[in-house]
């Protein structure tokens, strides 16, 4: 149980900052998502697989999964909604159905889907509906978007085990849904922590979370 609480201990650090504030700080007048990401960069090849998770602000979650050995590409974007190629502003209006999500390409010979699930559940609060800390809205909901029956079964089994374990005082509300779509977010959202590490949100929210993550998952980190 302490293993989970160690990571969740960083949540209060974000009380003065919310990822949602970026809608004002980075708002653009462009009403179309003209990201230049090459689709092949987020498409697995014969030696890789893909996982799609939503667990809060993708600025934070991207920085976590980029650290994992065996993860070859992490793309921030939008998934689970009904509006094609949405902009960030549209998603923030809460009527596209999309969640902020990550498309994670990984090498199953190095890191398993089970291990990615472990990181997913232990680096956010899966008991808060449509909310992570100060970030509130359906775009911050907790979801595993499964790509095949094996991923579905593993996610459901892990969720059931967590609920049974009593690791959380409240029920887990993470949804487990079939993958339907993923639209890469605008370029300024990609590699956000790496490119903006000195920004206040990175210093006071993302960095503390990464430090906690690095201590707990030190055996899964990429070699420097």
Regions found by a protein language model. Give the residues of each.
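Bacterial N-terminal signal peptides
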Residues: 6-15
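Flexible coil/turn and secondary-structure edge motifs
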Residues: 16-224
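Positively charged n-region of N-terminal signal peptides that target proteins for export
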Residues: 1-4
């Amino acid at each position: 149980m302490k293993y989970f609480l160690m990571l969740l201990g960083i949540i209060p650090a974000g009380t003065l900052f919310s990822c949602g504030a970026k809608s004002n700080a980075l708002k653009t007048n462009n009403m179309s998502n003209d990201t230049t990401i090459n689709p092949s960069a987020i498409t697995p090849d014969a030696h890789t697989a893909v996982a799609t998770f939503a667990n809060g602000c993708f600025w934070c979650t991207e920085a976590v999964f980029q650290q994992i050995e065996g993860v070859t590409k992490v793309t921030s974007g939008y998934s689970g909604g009904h509006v094609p190629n949405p902009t960030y502003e549209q998603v923030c209006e809460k009527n596209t159905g999309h969640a902020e999500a990550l498309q994670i390409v990984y090498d199953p010979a190095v890191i398993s889907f089970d291990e990615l699930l472990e990181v997913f559940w232990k680096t956010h609060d899966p008991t808060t509906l449509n909310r992570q800390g100060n970030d509130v809205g359906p775009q911050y909901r907790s979801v595993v978007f499964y790509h095949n029956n094996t991923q579905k079964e593993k996610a459901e089994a892990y969720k059931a085990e967590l609920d049974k374990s009593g690791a959380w005082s409240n029920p887990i509300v993470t949804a487990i849904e079939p993958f339907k779509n993923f639209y890469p977010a605008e370029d300024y959202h990609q590699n956000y922590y790496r490119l903006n590490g000195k920004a206040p949100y990175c210093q006071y929210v993302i960095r503390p979370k990464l430090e906690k993550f690095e201590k707990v998952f030190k055996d899964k980190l990429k070699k420097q």
